[in-house]
Swiss-Prot record:
This is Cytochrome b. One of its GO terms (cellular component) is mitochondrial inner membrane. It is a multi-pass membrane protein. Heme b b566 binds at residues 97, 196. Pfam families: Cytochrom_B_C, Cytochrome_B. Heme b b562 binds at residues 83, 182. The chain crosses the membrane at residues 33-53, 77-98, 113-133, 178-198, 226-246, 288-308, 320-340, 347-367. The cytochrome bc1 complex contains 11 subunits: 3 respiratory subunits (MT-CYB, CYC1 and UQCRFS1), 2 core proteins (UQCRC1 and UQCRC2) and 6 low-molecular weight proteins (UQCRH/QCR6, UQCRB/QCR7, UQCRQ/QCR8, UQCR10/QCR9, UQCR11/QCR10 and a cleavage product of UQCRFS1). This cytochrome bc1 complex then forms a dimer. Disulfide bonds: none annotated. Binds 2 heme b groups non-covalently. One of its GO terms (molecular function) is metal ion binding.
Amino acid sequence: MTNIRKSHPLVKIINNSFIDLPAPSNISSWWNFGSLLGICLALQILTGLFLAMHYTSDTATAFNSVTHICRDVNYGWVLRYLHANGASMFFICLYLHVGRGLYYGSYMYMETWNIGVILLFAVMATAFMGYVLPWGQMSFWGATVITNLLSAIPYIGTDLVEWIWGGFSVDKATLTRFFAFHFLLPFIIAAMVMVHLLFLHETGSNNPTGIPANADMIPFHPYYTIKDILGLLLMITALLILVLFSPDLLGDPDNYTPANPLNTPPHIKPEWYFLFAYAILRSIPNKLGGVLALVLSILILVIVPLLHTSKQRSMTFRPLSQCLFWLLTADLFTLTWIGGQPVEHPYVIIGQVASILYLSIIILLMPLTSLXENHXLKW
């Protein structure tokens, strides 16, 4: 009798994706983040579903419904903080996952990479809309400022903003539609994740050397299932420490004040995971220029495969490129810090220098350094 694992149409797909999948024998813990992102997505959908059972998307009651969840619903506070801090863990894993892709040249799998960039945009959109839902001060003003950026688009800008708002300001219609989209998008993301995996399994995983590992493959289970479980335990531990000891560490105190259109908070800023892009946006004095730079800061990932000039795929054996990569990492930390600071000297100039450095490392310095390394190796 044939094994059900290999004969049943549905189980066969799972088998070929997670059990008998041939994987390179040398992939490091940097390859754990894909599975962690899957767990994060499942956790967010699950906690979000239970939160949605008690949440009301009406401007009059939204803030109170979140308070009600935290105070009156059984373990509602756990659900709420798991969801809020789960988003932070999601973005930590996302940025590490993208960083791994950049370092080891995984972007050479073009289809997988481009679907990944679209996924990044979708997750960012979902997180932004989710931040609006508690209807605190930062929710309201964050929504106002970020959606208002679209008015910089020539000719159709103002109409587009009013269309998204459903009126002449961020109000009840905006909150209702943001809730609808925030609920819907994670399921679209889940479907796109399957496409992401489909493309990945067409080529197989990359590995730290960047050299094809076809001669030395091992089954995904038990080797990498065990390895992934270790990563999962570490992530869940970090998340639970965050939720149970300092749930508001990454949040903004202003969001505990109900939304008030007549009172602007002194410093409007998004959640920490958007601060680097926000800093790039603010570093350009022109509105349209800022919006373009904001979009380009993420969209630039799409052209990274086209800028690959090295004869080697991975950075493992390229010390000069490694230096640039870590400079880029430090630059992103700097931008994140600047995004949370007020718009005054010296933060403005630091933000502008960091923004120029960010773009020039990716567009100019990386390709030139790769060419220099090729030349040094006489390739």
